[in-house]
């Protein structure tokens, strides 16, 4: 019965409108009483989680907090490989049941959401050590610190002299209504996709970027349709991971084979 209820809740389009509205409201107000109660589902944090540390360097860059498709770590490695005067680190929240990618600092979701001590220590470590921070997907790098407001956390870093920019990844800023209008193949048109919350999230994040007034990067060029002022930062692909020695020198039969593992499965 519990499994059936979980499946029913997972298919948001099958829920009554008032229930969907209530779920969306809690998601949009994480520091409300229902939002605080919802955060308890992440569990009790264990103490002693480390914070970000950099190697000695002229410029010290943190990329956080989602590491979608391992790109946060890949970008950090690319920065260090390009310029020896840069120490780059990434931090990612570990979500049970989600995709697992290597990161310099992996923080359990219970710590990220509910450990005020870690949130404060991480902020202080970054504010005193980093020269640059790249905030991924407009998610708050320090969990629920200061009301879980990304703009407040960014402003606090800027006030401490840290240069902050944003990295938009996809659903965080891609407006479903616009995407459906311009592409008949839009995945947002799939009946299994719950569009209202995604539309709300994209509009919220677009407004956040406007308020913050910081530089913005996008990981795929199609996002320039939603964030026209952004700069494209290409994703990093390690060809060695995809190499197939058995096919070297052999003529491939049939069409090109491509593996696709989305960061968020619908």
Predicted regions and their residues:
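N-terminal pre-catalytic "stem/leader" segment of glycosyltransferase-like enzymes
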Residues: 14-140, 159, 172-179
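Helix-loop-beta element that forms the nucleotide-linked donor phosphate-binding surface
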Residues: 206-240
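Well-ordered, non-membrane alpha-helical segments in soluble/globular domains
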Residues: 113-120, 145-155, 197-206
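Membrane-proximal helix-turn-helix segments that form the acceptor-binding/catalytic region
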Residues: 154-156, 184-215
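Conserved donor-binding/catalytic core segment of Leloir-type glycosyltransferases
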Residues: 61, 244-266
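Short, flexible/disordered intra-domain loops and linkers
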Residues: 106-111, 140-150, 180-185, 191-192
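A structural signal for short, well-ordered beta-strand segments and their strand-loop junctions
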Residues: 87-92, 133-135, 162-168, 216-220, ...
């Amino acid at each position: 019965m519990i499994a059936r209820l979980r499946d029913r809740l997972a298919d948001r389009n099958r829920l009554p409108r008032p229930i969907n509205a209530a779920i969306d409201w809690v998601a949009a107000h994480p520091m409300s009483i229902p939002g605080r109660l919802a955060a308890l589902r992440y569990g009790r944090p264990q103490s002693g989680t480390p914070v970000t540390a950099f190697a000695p360097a002229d410029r010290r860059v943190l990329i956080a907090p989602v590491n979608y498709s391992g790109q946060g770590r890949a970008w950090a490695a690319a920065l260090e490989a390009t310029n020896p005067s840069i120490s780059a680190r990434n931090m990612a929240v570990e979500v049970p049941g989600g995709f697992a990618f290597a990161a310099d600092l992996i923080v359990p979701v219970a710590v990220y959401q509910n450990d005020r001590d870690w949130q404060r220590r991480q902020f202080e470590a970054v504010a005193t050590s980093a020269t640059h921070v790249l905030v991924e997907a407009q998610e708050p790098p320090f969990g629920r610190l200061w009301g879980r407001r990304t703009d407040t956390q960014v402003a606090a870093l800027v006030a401490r002299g840290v240069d902050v920019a944003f990295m938009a990844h996809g659903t965080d800023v891609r407006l479903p209504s616009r995407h459906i209008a311009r592409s008949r193949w839009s995945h947002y048109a799939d009946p299994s996709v719950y569009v209202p919350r995604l539309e709300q999230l994209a509009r919220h994040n677009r407004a956040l970027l406007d308020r913050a007034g910081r530089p913005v990067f996008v990981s795929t060029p199609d996002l320039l349709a939603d964030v026209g002022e952004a700069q494209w930062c290409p994703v990093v692909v390690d060809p060695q991971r995809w190499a197939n020695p058995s096919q070297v020198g052999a003529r491939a039969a049939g069409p090109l084979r491509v593996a696709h593992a989305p960061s968020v499965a619908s």
